[in-house]
């Protein structure tokens, strides 16, 4: 993640939306370079840290908020919960998401864990914290990403466009006041992690409920099927 202008590393709409935190993003770049220099490294790879902001800002219609990237090298790829097509087995959180997808909509289990088709349809797959130290979950909480992702969501809810939010876990739930103030409908449940999925994630029907809410807003539903 180099020190380039935002307009060179993300969608122009997102560059404008995140301009108020441009200095924070640059500071996070400095932090990540220092992590590399100290031999600690970080995930995902630098070119993928801001990947969620490469799809058009104006097209976002569903926001899915997670916590932080998978801490396993080779797993995180810049979209929350998603992994590269060649990752096998997929992370257990993602397996739980696919189980709920099947139960909710009856879609067959996807052949891989790549959620790019959702992103291509305007589903913003955003972690509250955008990086992590390898093997150390939650290690970059409180380092500065929270201000960036909060600004991203503030900008989203300020648009005059249909939006539905899906909040998975306690970190994501901290965004409820922002959504409530802007009258953005949201679906809240436990995180799909094996540690918490049985406490309210399973049976929450987030995919069908999101489409029902989009329909109420006059927006096209998402085709949640994956190859």
Swiss-Prot record:
GO terms under cellular component: cytoplasm
Pfam families assigned: UDG (PF03167)
Main location: cytoplasm
CDD domains: UDG-F1-like
Localization of this protein: Cytoplasm
EC number assigned by the record: 3.2.2.27
Catalyses which reaction(s): Hydrolyzes single-stranded DNA or mismatched double-stranded DNA and polynucleotides, releasing free uracil
Sequence similarity: Belongs to the uracil-DNA glycosylase (UDG) superfamily. UNG family.
Entry-linked HAMAP family: UDG
Name of protein: Uracil-DNA glycosylase
């Amino acid at each position: 993640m180099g020190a380039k202008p935002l307009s060179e590393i993300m969608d122009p709409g997102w560059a404008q939306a995140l301009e108020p935190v441009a200095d924070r993003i640059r500071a996070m770049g400095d932090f990540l370079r220092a992590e590399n220099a100290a031999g600690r490294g970080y995930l995902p790879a630098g070119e993928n840290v801001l990947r969620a902001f490469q799809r058009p800002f104006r097209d976002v219609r569903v926001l899915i908020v997670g916590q932080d990237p998978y801490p396993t090298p080779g797993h995180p790829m810049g979209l929350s919960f998603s992994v590269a097509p060649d990752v096998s087995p997929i992370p257990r959180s993602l397996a739980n998401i696919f189980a709920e997808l099947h139960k909710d909509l009856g879609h067959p289990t996807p052949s891989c864990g790549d959620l790019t088709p959702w992103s291509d349809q305007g589903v913003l797959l955003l972690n509250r914290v955008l990086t992590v130290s390898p093997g150390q979950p939650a290690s970059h909480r409180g380092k500065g990403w929270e201000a960036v992702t909060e600004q991203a969501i503030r900008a989203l809810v300020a648009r005059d466009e249909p939006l539905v939010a899906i909040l998975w876990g306690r970190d994501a739930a901290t965004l409820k006041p922002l959504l409530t103030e802007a009258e953005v409908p949201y679906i809240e449940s436990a995180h799909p992690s094996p540690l918490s999925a049985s406490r309210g994630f399973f049976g929450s029907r987030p995919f069908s409920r999101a489409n029902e809410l989009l329909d109420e807003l006059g927006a096209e539903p998402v085709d949640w099927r994956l190859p």
